[in-house]
Design a protein with these regions (language model features):
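Glycine-centered, phosphate/nucleic-acid-interacting loop/turn motifs that mediate DNA/RNA or nucleotide
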Residues: 71
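N-terminal leader segment of winged-helix/HTH proteins
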Residues: 1-24
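Short, cationic-aromatic polyanion-contact patches
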Residues: 24-29, 45, 78-99
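A short acidic, leucine-rich amphipathic alpha-helix
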Residues: 48-51
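Short, hydrophobic-biased segments on the C-terminal half of alpha helices
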Residues: 64-65
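Short helix-capping/hinge SLiMs at alpha-helix to coil transitions
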Residues: 23-24, 38-41
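C-terminal regulatory/oligomerization modules of transcriptional regulators
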Residues: 115-147
Length: 147
């Protein structure tokens, strides 16, 4: 694959990632930065991210901070400098383990709320709680099997 073909393929990959992640609440910049880091062979500096994506360094900083905060990127310190490097995590289990725990907490909250509720509300809360627990358990199972 030529450099031009590789660049075009990476652009398509980043654009597709945007279309997939926007419904999940990711901004265009965050989704493109995530895809960029996933496609890179080596960690990137903020300057590289900003230059390669054609965005302001402040936007690259905001995007990487958000990705790091949710476990979708890793921040590395470059020895002997203040410069930071960013890379995609080697495992995606972190953000999904956090989501699994959140789903179980939501299910607990729904179960607590059922007390003293009417029949229809109790049934609705029970169904939602069961769904959330099943999703949390499914995530935990995948992490155990593949993580």
């Amino acid at each position: 694959m030529s450099n031009a073909d590789h660049a075009a393929s990476t652009e398509r990959f980043m654009d597709e990632m945007v279309s997939l992640m926007e419904p999940w609440g990711w901004s265009r910049t965050v989704a493109r930065t995530f895809a960029y880091l996933m496609a890179r062979e080596a960690p990137a500096t903020l300057d590289e991210i900003a230059d390669d994506l054609g965005i302001a360094k402040s936007n690259a900083s905001m995007a990487t901070r958000e990705l790091v905060d949710y476990g979708n990127a890793v921040r590395l310190r470059q020895p002997g400098t203040k410069q930071l490097l960013f890379e995609a995590p080697s495992s995606q289990t972190g953000p999904f383990a956090m989501r699994s725990a959140m789903l179980c907490k939501m299910a607990d909250l729904l179960d607590q709320q059922k007390q003293g509720m009417g029949e229809a509300a109790t049934a609705r809360l029970s169904r939602q709680s069961a769904f959330l627990r099943a999703m949390g358990e499914a995530i935990d199972s995948v992490i155990r099997d593949l993580g």
